[in-house]
Swiss-Prot record:
Protein's GO biological process: microtubule-based process
InterPro entries reported in the protein's UniProt record: Alpha_tubulin, Tub_FtsZ_C, Tubulin, Tubulin/FtsZ-like_C, Tubulin/FtsZ_2-layer-sand-dom, Tubulin/FtsZ_GTPase_sf, Tubulin_C, Tubulin_CS
EC number: 3.6.5.-
Protein name as annotated: Tubulin alpha chain
Location of this chain's protein in the cell: Cytoplasm, Cytoskeleton
Any single Pfam family the record assigns to this protein: Tubulin_C
Main localization of the protein described in the UniProt heading: cytoplasm
Cofactor: Mg(2+)
Site features described as Involved in polymerization, chain residue numbers: Y453
Species name: Toxoplasma gondii
Annotated family: Belongs to the tubulin family.
Residues where N6-acetyllysine is found: K40
Amino acid sequence: MREVISIHVGQAGIQIGNACWELFCLEHGIQPDGQMPSDKTIGGGDDAFNTFFSETGAGKHVPRCVFLDLEPTVVDEVRTGTYRHLFHPEQLISGKEDAANNFARGHYTIGKEIVDLSLDRIRKLADNCTGLQGFLMFNAVGGGTGSGLGCLLLERLSVDYGKKSKLNFCSWPSPQVSTAVVEPYNSVLSTHSLLEHTDVAVMLDNEAIYDICRRNLDIERPTYTNLNRLIAQVISSLTASLRFDGALNVDVTEFQTNLVPYPRIHFMLSSYAPIISAEKAYHEQLSVAEITNSAFEPASMMAKCDPRHGKYMACCLMYRGDVVPKDVNAAVATIKTKRTIQFVDWCPTGFKCGINYQPPTVVPGGDLAKVMRAVCMISNSTAIAEVFSRMDHKFDLMYAKRAFVHWYVGEGMEEGEFSEAREDLAALEKDYEEVGIETAEGEGEEEGYGDEY
C-alpha cells in the first residue's frame, strides 16, 4: 500500500482536519464510530482507502493521523465531538499551555516538551504502514503552535524520514484580515523553515476563501466551518486518486516531480471548481471546459494572489467524477490558446492531469451543490511572490522598530534568526523573479545556473 499520514498542528490545522476527516468518512461510507458496512474485507484487505485509514481486526477504520496542539481546548472538541470514536485516543495530543501566538514558544520552549511524544505516535503510525508514501501537514503559519511546533515537527521528520515526501497545507495570513499582531513575524520565521523542510506547500488564505463563499455560495457571513469545508474539498480532490481507483491516478510524489522546477520554488496556488450553491447548480451545465476555465479564474484562487501578474511554471489538474480524457485534452488545449494564461517559456507542456471516477461528495446540510464532476487545480506560478513581498513589507515595518521582539528573545530565540529568516525570504522573492524572466536564446547553456539552487 502507499499510505499517507496526516499531521494536524494547532487550531487551524485541527479544524481543517475535522472538516477533512468528516468528508473522507462520507466519501468512503465510514460511520462516525469507524464501522464501514460496505467493506467486505474485514480487518485489512487491499482496499484503496487503506492509504488513509488503517483497519483493526474488529473491522473498525482508524484514520492515519495525529492531532497536536499545545493547549487542550481545540483537541477537547475533537475528543467530545461527533467523531470522537473514530480516532484513537493516543492520536489526540494536547499540552497544558498554549504558544500564545509566539513562534519561539511553539518552536523552542513549549513545543519541544511535546515533540518527542508526537514523533513517537507518528513512528507508531509509520510502523503500521507497509509502504509509507509521505506526510500531509496541516497548519497555519500566522499563529504560534502551527508555525512553531509545525516547523519543529517538519525539521524532525526530515531527519527521521528523509526520503518521504512532505506536503504542507498552510493557512497563510490574509492581506486585510488579521488574527494576530505578530503574524508577520511568525510567518516569516516559519516560511524560513518551510523552504527547507517541506517538498510542496499549498497556500490557503482565509480572506480569499471568504470572498469565494460570499460570491459563489451567497453566504453573507461565512464561518470557519464554511471555509474549512471548502478546503476539505480541495484536499479530498488532491488525495482522491490515492483513495479511489481512476483512469489517471496521481501519486503524492508525482505532485512534487511535476510541480517543483527548483527545490525552493515549491509554494503552490490552489483552486477548485465548480463552487456553486444548490440553487444555482440546478440551471447550469457544468461541462469539463467550463469548470477548467473557472479553475483558472483569478477569483477562484484560494490565496489572495492574481496569477495574471505572473507566469505559470506548471499546473496539476485533478478531475473527478464523470470526466473522460478526451474532454480534458480539449479543455487543456483551449487553455493553452488563451492569452491571459501565460506559461514560462522554458516549460512547454506545463500540464499534469489526473482523472478519478469517484464524483465529489458533499456534506449533508453543507453549502456546496452535489455535482457530477469537479476539478481541483494546484499550480506553481511566479505570482505567488506577491504574497511573500506583502508579508515581508509588514515584517519590515515592525522589525525596524524591533516591536514585540522581546517576547521571542525571552523564549530563547536569538535576534539573528529574524534577520536570517528575512534574508532567506528576500532570496526567495529574487528566485521567483528569476524563474519568470524570459530565457534569451542560447544563453542558458554557458551561464552557471547551478549556483543559486
